[in-house]
Amino acid sequence: MLPIRLRLPRLFQSTLVSLSLVAGLSGPALAQAKLDAKYTAYLGGVTIGRGAWVIDYRDDQYTAAASGMATGLLKMFAGGTGTSASRGSVSNGQPVSRAYAATITASKKKDEVELAIENGAVKDYTVKPPSPEDPERIPIKENDRKGVTDPMTASLMRVGGNGDLMAPEACQRSSAIFDGRMRYDLKMSFKRMDKVKAEKGYQGPVVVCAVHFTPLAGHIPTRPVIKYLVALQDIEVWLAPVTGTRIVVPYRISVPTPVGDAVLEATQFIASPASKATPTSAKAL
């Protein structure tokens, strides 16, 4: 979601909190809404970054764009800014990714990814710089780029049916994600209901989901951060509704780390009727 260059939080910008949906969906839903959200990132209770996320969701298409920057001590020692964007079509109420782009700059180094996606298959992609060669890295094969979505589109989760969006069913989904460097699954399950009150915008119930991370390709299995994330049982994503649609998106993400919880939480969460399409930097490659 929001690009902040930290190992754990970045994985969930591009991951979890990065969350795609292979849940059963029913019937098209009218969708004309724009979400204007702002987030703050914390590590062990200390503010380390801020970001913004704008989504324009319509009957037949959507765009989403995010930006973020490091703050406080993290900015002093490492700095870091980033942008990411996605666009695609809406089919039977379900977002279908067509293009994704992300750029993260930290410590004078730039990381760039662009994806072109057609019918759930990555047709072309560029990654700069390439991932370092390592004999232990699981190679990304052609099949790893099929039946997937990008990290940002994965965060736009449609709830099927006509019932209440804020229900346990919102969590019952699994996501197949390719971010240009790694292919992984995120499996979600219902944990509990809660309530939130943003400084601006949404006040009301959220659905809290447990998330389990399973890397499939592009990673090094012996790397400590990968082993740590695979073993985690306490990753949470709090889902809030985008008024005017049957879409829910992350309001809060929490990932335990050895130095305290890494948390990304909305301070502003304002949904309004859609107007002009939101420009993004994601383009067809």
Predicted feature residues:
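N-terminal signal peptide c-region/cleavage motif recognized by signal peptidases
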Residues: 26-28
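Acidic, serine/threonine-rich low-complexity disordered tracts
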Residues: 31-119, 163-285
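Short, hydrophobic/amphipathic alpha-helical patches that form generic packing surfaces
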Residues: 21, 151-160
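Residue-level preference for alpha-helix termini and adjacent loops
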Residues: 24, 73-76, 147
